[in-house]
Amino acid sequence: MTKQFAVIGNPIEQSRSPELHHAFAEKLGIELNYSKRLAPLDGFEANVKTFFDQGGLGINVTVPFKEQAFAMCHQLTERAKIAKAVNTLWIENGQLHGDNTDGQGLVDAIQALNWPLQGTRILILGAGGATRGVIYPLVQAGVTEIVIANRTQQRAEQLVQDLAGSVSEATLRVMTLDQLHGNFDLVINATSASLSGDALVLPETLQFKYAYEMAYGKPSSFLDQAKARGVPTTEGFGMLVGQAIEAFSIWHGVKPNLTDFL
């Protein structure tokens, strides 16, 4: 019987997970079926239970259910505990296990570009769930200082307070989006500001060597401004592939090569 996997979200049509997992499986000679499942906003838990009860082996979770998935799990990886969100589910010894592969996906994508992380100083724009999910893996990869910039400084300060004990190897600081300044190795945009048409201005007081846009496939004023400075830039497709590869390796015990799929 073909192994069954799925991605659950709402909306779900835009998900590229099935195409990625089928590509990984084909490359590695693994037979599987990976489907998209649209869950009603009040029906996520029932959807997960039904899928596993019917013999499904693994689920990826996308917007808006990652926090619900986190709350459902009996066992969590360290990075999922810190992220307080789960994007990868599986059953082991009768218990629901959860992981968050987003941050490792980002790290792997950056390393595939041969951009440095060890000993670097990084600025992340935004203090939402996307930022929370990537800080621990970035610190594990050797980043020594992370500054989180947000429109409301209080939210950034709360995030730093939440994470301080988990990432003691790195310095975490905050600033506001309208007071961006300093020298950084890398700037990561984890806000939707540059996509929604809101002005996200990168002032001359802010200097950086690389720019990463977490979103992909859409116009980005963040990337436009970085390109105008002549710094290397990329968008988030590599992170998408990286997090999918990490989930695939959890389920199948073998890790596809990221650069084969970029």
UniProtKB/Swiss-Prot annotation:
Gene Ontology biological process terms from the UniProt entry: amino acid biosynthetic process; aromatic amino acid family biosynthetic process; chorismate biosynthetic process; shikimate metabolic process
Stated name of the protein: Shikimate dehydrogenase (NADP(+))
Highest taxon of source: Bacteria
Binding site for NADP(+): 78, 126-130, 150-155, 214, 236
Subunit-structure text: Homodimer.
UniProt EC number: 1.1.1.25
Family of the protein in this entry: Belongs to the shikimate dehydrogenase family.
Lineage of producing organism: Bacteria, Pseudomonadati, Pseudomonadota, Gammaproteobacteria, Moraxellales
CDD domains assigned: NAD_bind_Shikimate_DH
Keywords noted in UniProt: Amino-acid biosynthesis, Aromatic amino acid biosynthesis, NADP, Oxidoreductase
Gene Ontology MF annotations: NADP binding; shikimate 3-dehydrogenase (NADP+) activity
Gene: aroE
